[in-house]
A protein has these predicted regions:
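Residues forming the flavin
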Residues: 1-220
């Protein structure tokens, strides 16, 4: 509503960023030090391709869940306050910030298109893939998921290949972040770690303002 109103007044709106990535699931044991001392560690990494990557929304002893975003299925996660309801896994997001330049001005639609692709490849759900399969460039299968050390907490996720979903720079950024985090919490880059995709964070348009938060219209 606000965007529509401001556009009618001829104001320039800004929103050229969207965050796209995966929900990572590993064991509580791997994340024990971070969970114990920080609960939710915040890590930021600059990938070799120039993207900014961050961790977000860590859930110790949590569960990966489906999020319905206007008909698009996305990955997300949560944890219960009651420890008796917890799982043996920790999940968190790895998100790659995509900042676009002119003439492109539809970042949210870009992320939606990538998310829909994952939905189509998983027949309406999201994809889960072992990190070891990502490194080998092959899709995960139900058999290989079951043989892994990490039991998926989201049973509706469909084994597949996130390499068919993400653009090259996005996937490379996610993998570089995973390897960097492995130095912080060894074992995270294990072949058994699970990646669910797509997770995305969308941003609203905002009016262009000066250093006093004024728009191009005097008094507004």
């Amino acid at each position: 509503w606000l965007s529509t109103l401001l556009k009618k007044r001829g104001l320039k709106m800004i929103n050229n960023q969207v965050d796209i990535g995966v929900r990572v699931e590993t064991s509580d044991i791997v994340m024990e030090e971070i969970n114990k001392h920080l609960y939710e560690g915040k890590f930021i990494f600059n990938a070799s391709v120039g993207t900014r990557v961050r961790t977000f929304c860590s859930n110790p002893s949590g569960y990966v869940v489906l999020e319905n975003h206007s008909g698009i299925m996305l990955a997300n996660g949560h944890a219960y306050s009651d420890p008796n309801l917890g799982s043996k896994n920790t999940n968190f997001a790895i998100l790659v910030s995509h900042v676009f330049s002119e003439p492109f001005d539809k970042p949210n639609e870009y992320a939606q298109a990538i998310s829909r692709l994952a939905n189509n490849l998983s027949n309406g759900s999201i994809i889960v893939q072992k990190y070891g399969d990502i490194l080998k460039g092959r899709r995960s299968t139900e058999k290989r998921i079951k043989e892994g050390f990490i039991e998926p907490t989201l049973k509706e996720a469909v084994p597949g290949d996130l390499g068919l979903v993400f653009p090259y720079n996005t996937m490379k950024s996610i993998m570089e972040m995973t390897e960097a985090l492995n130095h912080v919490t060894p074992g995270l880059a294990s072949e058994h770690t699970l990646f669910y995709g797509v997770e995305a964070k969308f941003y609203s348009e905002r009016p262009q303002v000066n250093d006093r938060f004024e728009t191009e219209i005097s008094g507004l």
